[in-house]
């Protein structure tokens, strides 16, 4: 029993908080992204497209993202 108490005391003294805070870090980092970035990343995952279709969709997605960015700038 003494070994367990010593290990516990060492852990508490180390200041390490354990795995429970890692989830918070993941949620904070994912919340900082925006939905346009997510759409682009998901579009890149589609493996059923040919090269021509992929380029066409990428161009249309980039254009719509730029239009949304310009609209946001004009609103502020």
From Swiss-Prot:
<feature type="site" description="Important for inhibition">
    <location>
        <position position="20"/>
    </location>
</feature>
<feature type="site" description="Important for inhibition">
    <location>
        <position position="16"/>
    </location>
</feature>
<dbReference type="GO" id="GO:0004862">
    <property type="term" value="F:cAMP-dependent protein kinase inhibitor activity"/>
</dbReference>
<dbReference type="GO" id="GO:0005737">
    <property type="term" value="C:cytoplasm"/>
</dbReference>
<keyword id="KW-0007">Acetylation</keyword>
<comment type="function">
    <text>Extremely potent competitive inhibitor of cAMP-dependent protein kinase activity, this protein interacts with the catalytic subunit of the enzyme after the cAMP-induced dissociation of its regulatory chains.</text>
</comment>
<keyword id="KW-0649">Protein kinase inhibitor</keyword>
<dbReference type="InterPro" id="IPR004171">
    <property type="entry name" value="cAMP_dep_PKI"/>
</dbReference>
<feature type="site" description="Important for inhibition">
    <location>
        <position position="19"/>
    </location>
</feature>
<protein>
    <recommendedName>
        <fullName>cAMP-dependent protein kinase inhibitor alpha</fullName>
    </recommendedName>
</protein>
<dbReference type="GO" id="GO:0005634">
    <property type="term" value="C:nucleus"/>
</dbReference>
<comment type="similarity">
    <text>Belongs to the PKI family.</text>
</comment>
<dbReference type="Pfam" id="PF02827">
    <property type="entry name" value="PKI"/>
</dbReference>
<feature type="region of interest" description="Disordered">
    <location>
        <begin position="49"/>
        <end position="76"/>
    </location>
</feature>
<feature type="modified residue" description="N-acetylthreonine">
    <location>
        <position position="2"/>
    </location>
</feature>
